[in-house]
Design a protein with these regions (language model features):
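Domain-core and long-helix interface of multi-subunit machines
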Residues: 1-65, 117
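Elongated, amphipathic alpha-helices that form coiled-coils and helical stalk/scaffold elements used
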Residues: 61-221
């Protein structure tokens, strides 16, 4: 009886040791004997030597991208836009997505900093691409459309990694100060010309209004 009890205890211990469970924050993919098995909820037996597992983080990653100064976005009308945008991305609880993330990203999904390195360049490129097709005024007046286009391009750019965008938010938008424009840059020189013309036109308009007001007051007197 003692031997039977001991054998049962050993078997229970081994089963407990060999059985791996997923959690809400971490799924895993088992490969090796019997092929691939994706475990999002529940668990699976993982046998040493004949099985390998890759953990996949399921948490939402928030990434803030700030473009300002010489890194600001160049718009369709050759203006420069300073922008702060927040991206929220994660691996969806879908077997195909988890499998893809395990293959392309591996354990980097568990490290927010490594994951940021993977996606931030793609997100920045999406911002630049959309900005290049809209004027500064259009971005300001159609923020929702701008975010929608950025989301579409950014989501497509990370789709092959198993990641998916949850949301994109534009936190702030402003024109880059004129001092930040580089006259030696073709795009900046065009933008500077437009800004200078606009500034001079506004000065002339203010001066005309001031003069008209002055004349009107003198005539009344």
């Amino acid at each position: 009886i003692i031997l039977i009890a001991l054998a049962i205890a050993i078997i229970v211990y081994l089963l407990h040791w060999l059985y791996r469970r997923s959690s809400k924050e971490v799924s895993f993919v088992r490969t090796g004997m019997f092929g691939e098995k994706v475990v999002i909820s529940g668990g699976a037996f993982v046998l040493p030597i004949i099985h390998n597992i890759t953990q996949v983080g399921m948490r939402t990653l928030s990434l803030t991208i700030k473009r300002s100064g010489d890194k600001s976005l160049i718009t369709k009308d050759r203006m420069r836009a300073e922008l702060v945008t927040e991206f929220y991305t994660k691996v969806p609880p879908d077997k195909k997505a988890v499998s893809t993330a395990a293959q392309t990203l591996g354990n980097r999904t568990l490290d927010p900093e490594h994951l940021r390195e993977v996606v931030q360049g793609r997100f920045a490129d999406a911002l630049g691409e959309v900005a290049a097709n809209m004027t500064l005024d259009e971005i300001q007046e159609n923020r929702g459309q701008f975010v929608k286009e950025v989301t579409k391009i950014a989501d497509e750019s990370i789709g092959h990694t198993g990641l998916a965008l949850e949301t994109v938010s534009m936190i702030s938008l402003d024109q880059t100060p004129i001092e930040q424009f580089n006259p030696a840059n073709t795009f900046d020189s065009q933008g500077l010309t437009q800004l200078t013309e606009q500034i001079e036109a506004r000065k002339k308009k203010r001066n005309d209004i001031t003069q008209d007001t002055k004349i009107s007051i003198e005539n009344k007197n």
